[in-house]
């Protein structure tokens, strides 16, 4: 290809000149062995090794053309090529178009300018013609992409993210090479002294990813799969490489978890011209995602918020009159600040609250200041901004985008997390400054609605205010303490600001740890969790969602109804319909908002507590924050997030409570207790008034509080737990301890806890103060950091998801092993292949939506499903009958048979049932499967199925199916037509796909699970008609085409075919013939007599068989009211018959025009003439009204040939089986055992160029070689 001219100083270093003229030189890289160039011996090996180690572009383009003027020492690269043919074309173009022109110039500088301009013009023209879009990738990276695709056979859909120089340890020997990291694969390539090594691992197969340090190797990345371990070292920047590997592995785990694929973000701003382009656009995208994810987690922002940039600055804090050093973060809808010193100060300013952004006057004390004012009259002063003008411009742009919008149905259907809405209104509460939607009928700014006529709406007040009960004897002291807490918070708001824009400091955390006052709890939960932002930007969303979900029922709503009365049953708010109805609405609305989660046990307990302290809509948004941001993946069908944190807790217990860890592991207690603790935030194991204090801390600090508290509980019971003899005793110890945790500041009457109600201990457990327990957890385990938890979560996520996948595989195998003849090992390998094919189609594209093919809520056997395109590839690799061009047709028939529910997808059970019958079934089972595949109706003509008939007639015969009529009589009009050289063709319009699919369902109903016992009886199988029989014969013929005993099998099949044809003809005698109009005039030959010769032509040595069949006609040739018009349309179709003109004859096959022109082709067919044997003549029907006569262009020399199939001809499965048993060769073929593991191994190791038919195996696509 042509390249932008670049200077080259040493033209002959490592290059061999092959052609030269005064201005241009064509060179080949030393050591390149392609195109007969020779390997170059030792020097070639050294150069090849050097190219790999130094990542030279010569590995991709070993040929190049240089430009040089006679008097200059500087060369210019103007073209490069991967083959001699490609570079020669460029060379010839230069000689023909430029060489003569250059001799005209006198000045060498003019020549150089002309050549460079010409080459750049060619490149620009090529890009314009081929619509090549400019991207941010460097030329070097584009070369790496070409290498990656070529070296590993990856399709264009596989995107390379980055590549790094490193060493791979194969045994005890390091191999220096390059690691290529793509979206779905980790690849390594090395070429040293002629020895090549390749490694390809899918991210979804990685079970462990670690960065280790040893004495010999200070920096090693260890990659583990189920079957092997791989070590990489000698990285230039191991931290950057490992972070990217973690990110790509996380994307793969997300794909396994919920089928969430990767889509590149095209909205990233382009790099400035002055910026050095060092990374690919995809790498920039992933880096931006990682930064945005950390940004959202740090400030509790909505899931779709993208970080635009950050800069160092100082913030003036009025509460202590100081300038605090920190970082400002700017995104589409927020300006945030956090101090360099942890927990000193943080700030969140939504742009919807901003009124003024202005540059203040600079001074030596306050350089480059920026003032931001909000609607609640707070002003924030930032200073020491490096690029203040640019920052102000970006904020101004985002402010313009933040326009006022009212929530619409379109947003409801499309995006649930729109974050650029703004509604201006007054704050309606002490704490929250978020806007509320106001209506003329409600002065409080809340929208009242009654969606359930039987329940009182709770949208305007919390359940706690309606069901608040105080104990008179404890009223005064506890209420006084509660009042003091409220006053402390009000003082805090006055000093640090209130609402979303408040300064968050260490003082804020101290107040939270002392307990939030009950009257402020709901609003502070909204504020601290960030749920206030989603509520403010989605006014009316919850009401609309409830209205749309009311009255709809699914599995989630059934589970919700079942658990409603189990939600805090001890609290009076949930002992009547009002509280139950509110809980129902919130849970149902969320199930419809997020169908991937729907409803999970423990959500009802958490939501009921949220409803006690927050209004109904607020409780909904708190639940959204909890499920989607603060506890990710906790509440899905497999509680993956809770299992991940359970593993993290085990690691933390090992580090912080080592003396207890081994004992607890032996008892298995940690995994048992932690799941309920984490899923319900201790609400199900602690007294209610104590557990809500834990929830207070959780909304402020996040999951680290739960880990700290769990470790504190274990630490407080070390001695007792060490003395426990079994898990039951340990559980009792912990249960009693948690039951004794009390909140002495609570103004609520004591609510009996479930555990304490069931306890029969005589000796009460000493009381434990919840505030003291929380303080202890901070003192002993407060060093646990959020980023450390995220690192541990990643490690555990790999382990948990792969363990779940292995469990799923074992369950599937255990369920299906008794239904098939496969071994457990074979089934496990087949399942791995089946799932791999599904996953490959997810990221490389498929003919159906990946989300439709994977539903984790279904039983294990039905979770993964494949469509026909995927099945076709697996059929070709695994099924013993797949052979030749007919393989796709046979795959289509089997897929149609296995797809019992008609959804165009098959699950693993269906797939294995067909494969088991074909590979390990007995003779009768195999033949029954083959018979069933052909007794189904033909697929609709609009399906993209490979044709099984004459290609020459496909153009004419597409939508109208020739219907075989048994000709028993000809009237005078018909005889005249025959004498004139016309051929009778009865045409019946195709009824279309709908009728065909209905017919398919009728056939498939015979083999539904309910009728399996019936289908086992061969007598209940439908009969095979003549057209289906022809297709069955063709299938058998193609099955044997690559068999060593091909000739013997062919003759045996021909004998069976002849026998079955005779059986079918005899069977017709027992079928009552309808009354015919007219006499039994002229007669013709038996319809079947032409079939054997057409299906099984005589074949000479080395000649291929030619098998033809009937093709349907196009809709444009459908019968018209005037017969002669259709005849005119088909005038050019030449049909030939084997019978004499003077006999109305019926034949079974149609021969294309191309074949009739080839004498040798015609002579190879064994065609029986029916006119010479009077005893073989049959009576013919009268020609019907829909009969069309077509003139033959061959005149009297051409023999008319009928395309009709006999509708009365049919055979049964018993006849087919009995006939085949007469041929030992066929019996031996179908009884032959199939080595399944060999086929599976072949399928695992195969690598397809381009879009794969089946992906590579369970684990490595290609093994290390060399």
From Swiss-Prot:
Residues 146-213, 293-361 form the GRAM domain. Residues 886-921 form the EF-hand domain. The record marks 601 as: Glutamine finger. The keyword Repeat applies. Gene3D superfamilies: EF-hand, Pleckstrin-homology domain (PH domain)/Phosphotyrosine-binding domain (PTB), putative rabgap domain of human tbc1 domain family member 14 like domains, Ypt/Rab-GAP domain of gyp1p, domain 1, Ypt/Rab-GAP domain of gyp1p, domain 3. The arginine and glutamine fingers are critical for the GTPase-activating mechanism, they pull out Rab's 'switch 2' glutamine and insert in Rab's active site. This is TBC1 domain family member 9. It comes from Homo sapiens (Human). The gene is TBC1D9.
């Amino acid at each position: 290809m042509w390249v932008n001219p670049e200077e080259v100083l040493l033209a002959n270093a490592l290059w061999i000149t092959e052609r030269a003229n005064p201005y241009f030189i064509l060179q080949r890289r030393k050591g390149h062995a392609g195109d007969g160039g020779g390997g170059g011996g030792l020097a070639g090996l050294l150069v090849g090794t050097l190219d790999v180690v130094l990542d030279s572009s010569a590995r991709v383009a070993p040929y190049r053309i240089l430009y040089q003027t006679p008097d200059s020492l500087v060369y210019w690269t103007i073209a490069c090529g991967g083959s001699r043919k490609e570079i020669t074309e460029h060379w010839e173009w230069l000689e023909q178009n430029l060489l003569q022109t250059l001799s005209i110039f006198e000045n060498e500088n003019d020549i150089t300018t002309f050549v460079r301009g010409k080459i750049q013009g060619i490149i620009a023209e090529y890009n314009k013609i081929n619509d090549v879009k400019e991207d941010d990738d460097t030329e070097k990276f584009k070369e790496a992409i070409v290498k990656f695709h070529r070296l590993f056979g990856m399709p264009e859909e596989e995107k390379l993210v980055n590549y790094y120089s490193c060493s791979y340890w194969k045994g005890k020997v390091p191999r220096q090479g390059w690691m290529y990291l793509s979206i779905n694969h980790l690849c390594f390539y090395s070429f040293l002294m002629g020895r090549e090594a390749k490694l390809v691992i899918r991210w979804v197969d990685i079970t462990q990813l670690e960065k280790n340090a040893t004495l010999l190797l200070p920096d090693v990345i260890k990659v583990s799969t189920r079957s092997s371990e791989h070590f990489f070292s000698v990285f230039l920047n191991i931290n950057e490489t490992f972070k990217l590997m973690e990110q790509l592995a996380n994307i793969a785990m997300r794909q396994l978890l919920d089928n969430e694929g990767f889509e590149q973000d095209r909205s990233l701003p382009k790099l400035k011209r002055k910026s050095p382009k060092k990374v690919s656009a995809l790498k920039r995208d992933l880096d931006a995602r990682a930064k945005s994810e950390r940004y959202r987690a740090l400030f509790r922002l909505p899931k779709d918020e993208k970080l635009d940039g950050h800069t160092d600055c100082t913030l003036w804090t009025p509460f202590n009159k100081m300038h605090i050093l920190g970082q400002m973060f700017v995104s589409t809808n927020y300006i945030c600040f956090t101090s360099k010193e942890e927990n000193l100060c943080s700030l969140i300013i939504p742009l919807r609250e901003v009124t003024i952004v202005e540059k203040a006057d600079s001074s030596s004390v306050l350089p480059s200041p920026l003032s931001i004012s909000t609607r609640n009259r707070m002003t924030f002063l930032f200073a020491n901004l490096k690029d203040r003008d640019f920052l102000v411009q970006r904020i101004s742009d985002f402010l313009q985008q933040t326009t006022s919008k009212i929530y619409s149905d379109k947003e409801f259907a499309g995006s649930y997390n729109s974050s650029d809405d703004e509604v201006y209104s007054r704050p309606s509460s002490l704490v929250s400054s978020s806007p509320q939607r106001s209506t003329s009928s409600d002065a409080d700014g809340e929208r009242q609605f009654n969606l359930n006529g039987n329940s009182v709406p709770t949208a305007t007040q919390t359940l706690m205010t309606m069901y608040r009960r105080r104990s008179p004897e404890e009223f005064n002291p506890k209420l006084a303490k509660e009042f003091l807490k409220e006053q402390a918070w009000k003082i805090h708001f006055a000093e640090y600001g209130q609402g979303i824009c408040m300064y968050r400091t260490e003082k804020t955390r101290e107040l939270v740890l002392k307990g939030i006052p009950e009257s402020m709890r709901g609003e502070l939960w909204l504020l601290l969790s960030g749920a206030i932002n989603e509520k403010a930007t989605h006014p009316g969303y919850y009401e609309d969602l409830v209205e749309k979900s009311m009255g709809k029922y699914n599995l989630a709503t059934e589970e919700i109804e079942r658990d409603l009365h189990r939600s805090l049953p001890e609290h009076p708010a949930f002992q009547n319909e009002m509280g139950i109805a509110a809980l129902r609405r919130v849970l149902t609305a969320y199930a419809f908002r997020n169908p991937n989660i729907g409803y999970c046990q423990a959500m009802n307990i958490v939501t009921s507590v949220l409803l006690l302290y927050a209004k109904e809509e607020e409780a909904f948004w708190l639940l959204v924050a909890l499920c989607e941001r603060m506890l990710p993946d906790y509440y899905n069908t497999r509680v993956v997030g809770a299992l991940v944190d359970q593993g993290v807790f085990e690691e933390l217990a090992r580090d912080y409570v080592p003396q207890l860890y081994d004992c607890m592991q032996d008892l298995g207690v940690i995994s048992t207790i932690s799941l309920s603790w984490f899923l319900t935030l201790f609400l199900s194991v602690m007294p209610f008034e104590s557990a809500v204090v834990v929830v207070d801390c959780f909304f402020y600090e996040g999951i680290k509080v739960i880990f700290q508290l769990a470790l504190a509980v274990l630490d407080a019971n070390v001695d007792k737990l060490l003395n426990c003899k079994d898990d039951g005793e340990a559980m009792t110890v912990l249960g009693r301890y948690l039951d004794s945790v009390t909140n002495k500041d609570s103004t609520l009457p004591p609510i009996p806890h479930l555990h304490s109600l069931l306890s029969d201990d005589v000796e009460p457990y000493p009381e434990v103060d919840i505030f003291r327990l929380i303080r202890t957890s901070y003192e002993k385990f407060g060093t646990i950091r959020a980023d450390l938890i995220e690192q541990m979560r990643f490690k555990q996520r790999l382990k948990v998801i792969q363990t779940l996948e292995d469990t799923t595989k074992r369950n599937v195998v255990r369920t299906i092993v008794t239904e098939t003849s496969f071994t457990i090992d074979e089934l496990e390998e087949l399942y791995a292949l089946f799932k791999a094919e599904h996953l490959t189609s997810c990221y490389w594209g498929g003919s159906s939506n990946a989300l439709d093919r994977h539903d984790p809520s279904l039983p294990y056997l039905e979770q993964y499903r494949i469509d026909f395109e995927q099945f076709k590839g697996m059929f070709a690799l695994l099924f013993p009958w797949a052979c030749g061009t007919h393989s796709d047709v046979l795959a289509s028939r089997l897929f149609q048979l296995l797809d019992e529910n008609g959804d165009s997808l098959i699950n693993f059970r269906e797939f294995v049932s067909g494969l088991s019958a074909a590979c390990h079934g007995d003779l009768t089972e195999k033949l029954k499967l083959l018979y069933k595949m052909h007794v189904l109706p033909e697929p609709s003509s609009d399906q993209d199925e490979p044709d099984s008939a004459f290609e020459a007639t496909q153009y004419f015969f597409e939508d109208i199916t020739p219907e075989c009529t048994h000709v028993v009589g000809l009237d005078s009009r018909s005889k005249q037509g025959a004498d004139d050289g016309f051929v009778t063709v009865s045409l019946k319009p195709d009824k279309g796909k709908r009728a065909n699919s209905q017919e398919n369902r009728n056939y498939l109903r015979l083999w539904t699970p309910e009728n399996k016992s019936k289908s086992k009886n061969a007598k209940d199988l439908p009969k095979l008609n003549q057209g289906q029989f022809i297709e069955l014969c063709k299938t058998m013929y193609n099955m044997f085409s690559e068999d060593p005993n091909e000739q013997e099998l062919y003759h045996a099949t021909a004998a069976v075919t002849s026998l079955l044809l005779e059986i079918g003809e005899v069977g017709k005698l027992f079928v009552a013939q309808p009354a015919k109009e007219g006499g039994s005039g002229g007669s013709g030959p038996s319809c079947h007599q032409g079939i054997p010769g057409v299906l099984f032509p005589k074949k000479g040595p080395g000649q291929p068989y030619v098998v033809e069949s009937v093709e349907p006609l196009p809709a444009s040739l459908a019968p018209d009211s005037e017969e002669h018009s259709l005849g005119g349309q088909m005038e050019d179709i030449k049909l030939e018959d084997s019978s004499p003109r003077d006999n109305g004859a019926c034949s079974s096959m149609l021969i294309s025009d191309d074949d009739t022109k080839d004498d040798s082709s015609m002579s190879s067919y064994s065609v029986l003439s029916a006119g010479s044997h009077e005893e073989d003549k049959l009576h013919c029907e009268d020609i019907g009204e829909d009969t069309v006569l077509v003139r033959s262009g061959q005149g009297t020399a051409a023999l008319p040939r009928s395309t009709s199939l006999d509708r009365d001809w049919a055979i049964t499965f018993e006849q087919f089986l009995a006939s085949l048993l007469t041929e030992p060769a066929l019996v031996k073929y179908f009884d032959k055992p199939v080595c399944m593991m060999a086929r599976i191994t072949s399928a695992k190791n195969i690598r397809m160029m381009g879009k794969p038919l089946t992906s590579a195996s369970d684990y490595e696509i290609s093994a290390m070689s060399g």
